[in-house]
Amino acid sequence: MTIMRKNHPLLKIINNSFIDLPTPCNISSWWNFGSLLGICLMVQIITGLFLAMHYTSDTATAFSSVAHICRDVNYGWLIRYMHANGASMFFICLFIHVGRGIYYGSYMLSETWNIGIALFLTTMATAFVGYVLPWGQMSFWGATVITNLLSAIPYIGSTLVEWIWGGFSVDKATLTRFFAFHFILPFIITAFVLVHLLFLHETGSNNPSGLNSDSDKIPFHPYYTIKDILGILMLLMVLMILVLFFPDVLGDPDNYTPANPLNTPAHIKPEWYSSLAYAILRSIPNKLGGVTALILSILILAMFPLINSSKLLGLVYRPITQAMYWIFIANLFILTWIGGQPVEYPFTMIGLISSILYFSIIVMFMFIASMIENNILKSH
C-alpha cells in the first residue's frame, strides 16, 4: 500500500516541500535562515493576533491600551515584548538570509530572488506601520517624517501625503489605517513566502560549492528537519533571553512618552533595522534625491543577477570579490550606526561616504573584481 503522504492531494504538496524534497547534501548552517524566517513569521502572526485583541487604534487610547496589555492582560507583557523583539530577530535572520544569497550566488535563481526582494520591501513596510501603533513620541514623529517623504514626488506629492494621512496631519485616521495595514500585510507576506518556496522548489536549492548538485541529493527529512529544529531552538533561546532580560535594549526610550505633536524629539531615530535605509536617505541633501536613494538602496538588490559576470558561482573561490563583499558588510554596519546618530558633523560626512560606497561596491567594484578574476582564470 502506497504511503498516504505521497497520494493525498494536500499531503502530497507538504511531502514534496518538506519531507521528500531532494536537497544538496552539502548545504551549511547559512541555509537554516529560511526556516528561521518562517518561524519568526509564525511567532509574529500569533503574538500579533493576541495583541490585536486588546489594542485600540484610537489616538486617545492607543498608548494606554499598550500599557493595559503590559499591566493587566495575562502574560500581556510577554506577548508584547515577544512581538517587539521578534521583529528584531526577524530582521536579523532576513539580513543574514540576503547576505548568504549574495555570498553564494543564490541571486542567479532570479524568480526566487525577485520575490525575495518583494518580501523584503513588504516586511519593511509592515515593520514601519507597526512601529507607529504604540503611539509614543518616536512612533508619531517617525510616521510624520517618513510619510512626509512622499511629498517629494513631483505634482502629486502633497495630495498623496494628505491621502495617506486621511487629513492634514498624522492623526486618528492615520493610526486606524496603519493598524489595518499592519494586520493585513503579514498575510500578504505569507502568500509571498509560498510563491518564494514554489519558485525555489522549481529549480532546487543552491549549495556552498556553486556546482550543480543534481547527482548528489538527499531527502530533506530527517537530515535537514533535525538541523532546522536545532536552529529554531537556538533562535527561540536568543529571543527569550532578549524578552526576559533585555526587553527594551533595541527600543527607543522616547516611545514611553505619549505622542505629542507640539514637542519634537531631539532627533528622529528609527528602529535599528530601518537605520541603514534612513542613513542613506539623510545623506542626500535633496529631498527627492534622498527618497530615490532610499528606494534604490533596496531595489539595487535586483541588479545582482544582471551585473554578475564571473565564470564562478558564489564567492567561495573568488578572493578579490570576497574582500569587496566583507567591505560591503562592514559598510552596512557603519550605515546602521549612522542612522541612529544626530544630523551633525562628522556623522553627516560619514553617512555620505558610506552611502556612496554602498552603491559603488554593488554597481562598480564587484563587477571590476569579477572581471579581474576572470582574466586570472583565463591566464591559467
UniProtKB/Swiss-Prot annotation:
Binding site for heme b b562: 83, 182
Residue stretches spanning the membrane: 33-53, 77-98, 113-133, 178-198, 226-246, 288-308, 320-340, 347-367
Coarse class of the protein's main subcellular location: mitochondrion
GO biological process, one term: mitochondrial electron transport, ubiquinol to cytochrome c
InterPro entries: Cyt_b/b6_C (IPR005798), Cyt_b/b6_C_sf (IPR036150), Cyt_b/b6_N (IPR005797), Cytb/b6-like_sf (IPR027387), Cytochrome_b (IPR030689), Cytochrome_b_C_euk/bac (IPR048260), Cytochrome_b_N_euk/bac (IPR048259), Di-haem_cyt_TM (IPR016174)
Protein residues bound to a ubiquinone: 201
One Pfam family linked to the record: Cytochrome_B
Record flagged with keyword Membrane: yes
Membrane topology: Multi-pass membrane protein
Keywords: Electron transport, Heme, Iron, Membrane, Metal-binding, Mitochondrion, Mitochondrion inner membrane, Respiratory chain, Transmembrane, Transmembrane helix, Transport, Ubiquinone
Co-factor binding details: Binds 2 heme b groups non-covalently.
Function: Component of the ubiquinol-cytochrome c reductase complex (complex III or cytochrome b-c1 complex) that is part of the mitochondrial respiratory chain. The b-c1 complex mediates electron transfer from ubiquinol to cytochrome c. Contributes to the generation of a proton gradient across the mitochondrial membrane that is then used for ATP synthesis.
UniProt family annotation: Belongs to the cytochrome b family.
Subunit structure: The cytochrome bc1 complex contains 11 subunits: 3 respiratory subunits (MT-CYB, CYC1 and UQCRFS1), 2 core proteins (UQCRC1 and UQCRC2) and 6 low-molecular weight proteins (UQCRH/QCR6, UQCRB/QCR7, UQCRQ/QCR8, UQCR10/QCR9, UQCR11/QCR10 and a cleavage product of UQCRFS1). This cytochrome bc1 complex then forms a dimer.
Name of this chain's protein: Cytochrome b
Organism: Calomys musculinus (Drylands vesper mouse)
